[in-house]
Amino acid sequence: MRRKIELMKSQRWTAKDSKKHIIVPSELDHKYSRGTLGVITGSAQFPGAAVLTSKAAIATGLGVLRFHSSSGLAHLVLHASPEALVQPGKVDAWLAGSGVSDKKYSDYTTWLRHRWFKLMSAQSVPTVLDAGALDWAGKLTQPTLITPHAGELAKLLVNRGIQVSSESIEADSKKWSMVAAEKLGVTVLLKGSTTYIAKPDFLIELPKATPWLATAGSGDVLAGIIGALVSTNYIEILNDENNLARVAATGAFIHNSAALLASKDSPISATSIIRFIPEAIRKII
């Protein structure tokens, strides 16, 4: 495996590559043909993640967003995005875990969010796992993408019997993204100053991100962008699972592009990134 990783060349992802995976609607489309994303994010500890993931997904462009919650989180999402639906139903893709602790019993709403995660196995559609849902990696039958940072990936691998520290992962992100993809049987987007998207025999490298992206909620925005793209590309992903990596790379490219537009070399917030998602997409297509 070590020799294979050393020889593996990464594909440098560009705007031209991204354009291929942004589905522009035609006059024949309607809301249900443009992708329905099921979202299970946010908790009492991190309620803002529910809003950020939902707003980012809607800003990216999709047909329907279904937010799954039996708590006050639904009211927060509806206040910020009245176009969201807040009842269960058929979905074309899942986004789960952002703003949810991996400590299932830390509080009542977190426990409830983990119960909602079980819906992912009931509808076998392409799935994005973040933060508190990362432990589902390798446990689902559908094409699955995980979006950890180094600390989360280290914890996940240690729990699966692979001893590694977050410092080691940060020192060689390329290697560990590929190790994780092979050992877990999923597509891995490893977040960092340089983001890698890995499958065992397939590696994409994103341009170095603006340092201003190191801000609270930025990862939730990324998850929402990718979730929307997965829902609009779900047929392509089911036909060729490598497209999940390409769609994830497109989401990361849009995320950084929106951050650059929002920043102009000055501080930004997660909310300000969302405002520039449509402009970032317009420049790509």
Summary of predicted features, one role per range:
Residues 1-128, 135-142, 155-285:
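Small-residue (G/A/S/T)-rich helix-start motifs and N-terminal tracts that mark the onset
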